[in-house]
Regions:
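Conserved alpha-helix/loop element of class I SAM-dependent methyltransferases that forms part
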Residues: 6-24
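Conserved beta-strand signature within the Rossmann-like core of class I S-adenosyl-L-methionine
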Residues: 111-118
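A short, conserved alpha-helix within the catalytic core of class I
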Residues: 95-104
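Class I SAM-dependent methyltransferase SAM/SAH-binding core
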Residues: 33-35, 39-76
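Conserved beta-strand/loop positions that form the S-adenosyl-L-methionine
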Residues: 29
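Conserved Class I S-adenosyl-L-methionine
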Residues: 155-191
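A conserved beta-strand element that flanks and buttresses the S-adenosyl-L-methionine
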Residues: 87
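C-terminal alpha-helical "lid/dimerization" subdomain adjacent to the S-adenosyl-L-methionine
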Residues: 120-168
Length: 194
């Protein structure tokens, strides 16, 4: 079933990044019940989703019988695979930041894209002010779209601030672009050089 929340609100942003592409091999890390993978499927010949939660993977298998869906951690994914697209929607903050970014670089094919809809910790005055200013917009969006608040996924509090994420990305994924989004999220896009 379709649903809307502060994470799926950014699925159109991800789809815009791959418009015009086809035949992609995609990996969705923290795929949950597979809604993003389903939306990516017209652009992909290979769909792989991983999630540590067995019940989420079971729901994803019902949604996407043609996809490879695995109950496992990103750290355990074999490095002999490679992908044109790696997505992480509200999952990067569940993992160790720098080792995860290094692993993404290993798994991305030349010209491949890494797209993140992420959560960051509020550590500075600016972080708190921007978060407070987002409340009205987020509340209106939630009401208009009838937000599905509990879709049965694990939650974790983010550890790194946006400034810390920017620093790590600049070091490990040179050229990565990061911007704040609404709904308390940031967007990261990176394309590995061809």
């Amino acid at each position: 079933a379709e649903y809307w929340n502060h994470n799926s609100a950014y699925h159109p942003w991800i789809l815009r990044q791959i418009t015009g592409h086809s035949g992609l091999a995609a990996l969705d890390v923290g795929c949950g019940e597979g809604l993003l993978l389903q939306r990516l499927s017209p652009y992909c010949t290979t769909l792989v989703g991983i999630d540590p939660d067995p019940s989420s993977i079971a729901r994803a298998r019902r949604r996407l019988p043609q996809a490879t869906l695995l109950t496992q951690l990103f750290d355990d994914l074999p490095t002999d695979q490679s992908f044109d697209l790696i997505t992480m929607v509200a999952s990067l903050h569940h993992m160790e930041l720098e080792p995860t970014l290094h692993r993404v670089r290993q798994l991305l094919r030349p010209g491949g894209q890494f797209l993140v809809v992420g959560l960051s910790a509020r550590k500075s005055v600016a972080d708190w002010v921007i978060s407070a200013l987002s409340v009205p917009v987020a509340s209106i969006g939630s009401a208009l779209h009838r937000e599905a608040r509990d879709i049965g996924v694990q939650v974790a509090q983010p550890r790194e601030s946006l400034a810390e994420i920017r620093t790590a990305a600049a070091k490990i994924l040179p050229g990565a672009r990061i911007r704040r989004g609404v709904y308390y999220r940031y967007l990261l896009s990176y394309q590995r050089p061809a």
